[in-house]
């Protein structure tokens, strides 16, 4: 089972696609710098640690104002 749950994560970030993008970018940062904000993470992988940071609200994002025009 995924910990933290997808339902819990989607209360923090509005879209599952945005959630994946934010978590992936943070995981790449952690791979390079190894600077996890969570003191005792449950996961040992960077993506899991990034999701834990999002769930703890230690990580946030600012939505872009750009709109796609056709």
Swiss-Prot record:
Stated name of the protein: DNA-directed RNA polymerase subunit omega
Enzyme Commission designation: 2.7.7.6
Keywords annotated in UniProt: DNA-directed RNA polymerase, Nucleotidyltransferase, Transcription, Transferase
SMART domains: RNA_pol_Rpb6 (SM01409)
Naturally occurring in which organism (per UniProt): Bacillus anthracis
Function of the protein: Promotes RNA polymerase assembly. Latches the N- and C-terminal regions of the beta' subunit thereby facilitating its interaction with the beta and alpha subunits.
Known partners and oligomeric status: The RNAP catalytic core consists of 2 alpha, 1 beta, 1 beta' and 1 omega subunit. When a sigma factor is associated with the core the holoenzyme is formed, which can initiate transcription.
Taxonomic lineage: Bacteria, Bacillati, Bacillota, Bacilli, Bacillales
Reactions this protein catalyses: RNA(n) + a ribonucleoside 5'-triphosphate = RNA(n+1) + diphosphate
Single biological process term from Gene Ontology: DNA-templated transcription
Keyword Glycoprotein attached: no
